[in-house]
């Protein structure tokens, strides 16, 4: 059963792997013209960064849709909270159904979709698994489904970052080798640790410094904001697991993708912040827009009769 499922997934990933190999070889060839060697681990690592650039640039329209969806969710958060308060403490099936129906009606009327914010991550998962398969295939046989075949596939397999770190090596592989008293690669463990630390640092900075500036004050006590705070603690744990288990090539992909996400979020918030947020007020100040409440009003002329009455 599981063998059949695995073969089915392999067949689905074939076209994705082919596209990934095409992009990797394109950037590797381009870097070759710039003086990087065929077996240079840095060349292949930068090719993976190039893959990130292509994928994330392609997903910019999806990211913009995600931003709009997040903004809609923040706008309707007070209404959602009122419905939740209305049914607070009611655990019967009828009450729960009524609450869900009212919330779905709000989503429909306001054009909000809670799942839209997950689209960029969901759409990247096939690329993640495809790249994992490409690295695994290169490690096992040095052959791919596209241009990573023959000598080029062998070059990809034999490439080393800093001359010693294979793209297919992982922290866990060398950690277990160390535990067993076998030969291990300390540099691989250091590189994997550094990449994981960068992923966590970028994520924490984005969640603590960038995103809160775009949250309106009336939305900071809502479940949407609280869920984001929960993710603040869950994502570093997930990244630690990735850093321990996944090959260096995959860590390069996710680190570069994480940096892209952080910069993209910062630029989007800087240029188009949510109304009512700190970022929105800062943008108004940058543009020299005065608040209507504090803007001075032109004094009205007083006619002679009104002046005499005074």
From Swiss-Prot:
Pfam family, one: 60KD_IMP
Membrane topology: Multi-pass membrane protein
Subcellular location: Cell membrane
InterPro entries the UniProt entry points to: YidC/ALB3/OXA1/COX18 (IPR001708), YidC/Oxa/ALB_C (IPR028055), YidC_ALB_C (IPR047196)
Top-level taxon: Bacteria
Transmembrane segments: 16-36, 44-64, 115-135, 186-206, 232-252
Ranges for region Disordered: 290-310
Example of a GO cellular component annotation carried by this entry: plasma membrane
Role played: Required for the insertion and/or proper folding and/or complex formation of integral membrane proteins into the membrane. Involved in integration of membrane proteins that insert both dependently and independently of the Sec translocase complex, as well as at least some lipoproteins. Aids folding of multispanning membrane proteins.
Oligomer and partners: Interacts with the Sec translocase complex via SecD. Specifically interacts with transmembrane segments of nascent integral membrane proteins during membrane integration.
Family: Belongs to the OXA1/ALB3/YidC family. Type 1 subfamily.
Protein name per UniProt: Membrane protein insertase YidC
Gene it is expressed from: yidC
């Amino acid at each position: 059963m599981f063998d059949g499922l695995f073969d089915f997934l392999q067949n689905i990933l074939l076209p994705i792997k082919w596209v990934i190999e095409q992009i990797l070889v394109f950037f590797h060839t381009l870097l070759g013209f710039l003086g990087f060697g065929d077996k240079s681990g840095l060349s292949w690592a930068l090719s993976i960064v190039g893959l990130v650039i292509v994928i994330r640039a392609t997903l910019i329209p999806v990211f913009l849709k995600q931003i709009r969806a997040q903004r809609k969710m923040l706008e309707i958060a007070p209404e959602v909270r009122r419905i939740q308060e209305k049914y607070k403490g009611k655990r019967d099936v009828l009450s729960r159904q009524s609450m869900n129906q009212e919330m779905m009606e709000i989503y429909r009327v306001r054009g909000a979709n809670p799942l839209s914010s997950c689209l960029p991550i969901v759409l990247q998962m096939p690329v993640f698994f495809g790249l994992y398969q490409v690295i695994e295939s290169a490690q096992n046989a040095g052959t791919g489904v596209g241009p990573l075949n023959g000598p080029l596939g062998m070059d990809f397999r034999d490439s080393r970052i800093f001359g010693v770190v294979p793209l297919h090596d992982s922290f866990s592989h060398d950690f277990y080798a160390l535990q067993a008293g076998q030969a291990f690669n300390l540099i691989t463990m250091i590189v994997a640790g550094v990449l994981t630390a960068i992923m966590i640092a970028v994520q924490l900075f984005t969640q603590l410094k960038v995103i809160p500036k775009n949250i309106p004050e009336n939305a900071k006590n809502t479940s949407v904001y609280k869920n984001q705070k929960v993710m603040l603690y869950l994502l570093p744990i997930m990244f630690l697991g990735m850093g321990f288990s996944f090959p260096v090539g995959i860590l390069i992909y996710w680190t570069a993708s994480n940096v892209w996400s952080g910069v993209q979020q910062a630029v989007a918030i800087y240029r188009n912040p949510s109304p009512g947020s700190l970022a929105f007020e800062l943008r108004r100040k940058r543009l020299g827009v005065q608040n209507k409440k504090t803007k001075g009003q032109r004094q009205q002329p007083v006619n002679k009769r009104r002046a005499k009455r005074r």
